[in-house]
């Protein structure tokens, strides 16, 4: 357990003890007594302090988590940009070259078959 968590636990226990003390004073002296009213103010002050510390700790944890996630998101964004800028253009160029090569091989094959077999094969550009 970290020191911050120990402090939070102590604060919660302190609030509980102050509430028990307030209930005791209320039963003993009544709700309108000066000590009961003073203890009620003490309970509110201690509870507010505990809630403030808890909120601070929660904010610190969330901020730390966001900083960790920010670094990971930035790395992923950098990878995506690299893939987008480099590999897409290279892949598109490779696919265009492959298509041109396939079209050339197809045209050569059709011409060879037409010449060898004395057939009049038409190259269909729509395919």
UniProtKB/Swiss-Prot annotation:
It is found in: Virion. GO terms for cellular component: viral tegument. Residues 60-109 form a coiled coil. Keywords: Coiled coil, Virion. It holds the Pfam family DUF2664. It comes from the Viruses. The keyword Coiled coil applies. Belongs to the herpesviridae UL96 family. This is Protein UL96. The lineage of its organism: Viruses, Duplodnaviria, Heunggongvirae, Peploviricota, Herviviricetes. The gene is UL96.
């Amino acid at each position: 357990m970290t020191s911050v968590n120990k402090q939070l636990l102590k604060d919660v226990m302190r609030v509980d003890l102050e509430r028990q003390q307030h209930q005791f004073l209320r039963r003993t002296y009544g709700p309108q007594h000066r000590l009961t009213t003073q203890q009620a103010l003490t309970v509110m002050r201690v509870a507010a302090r505990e809630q403030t510390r808890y909120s601070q700790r929660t904010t610190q944890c969330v901020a730390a988590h966001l900083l960790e996630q920010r670094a990971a998101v930035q790395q992923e964004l950098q990878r995506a940009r690299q893939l987008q800028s480099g590999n897409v253009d290279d892949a598109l160029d490779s696919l265009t070259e492959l298509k041109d090569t396939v079209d050339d091989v197809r045209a050569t094959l059709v011409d060879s078959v037409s010449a060898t077999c004395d057939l009049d094969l038409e190259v269909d550009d729509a395919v």
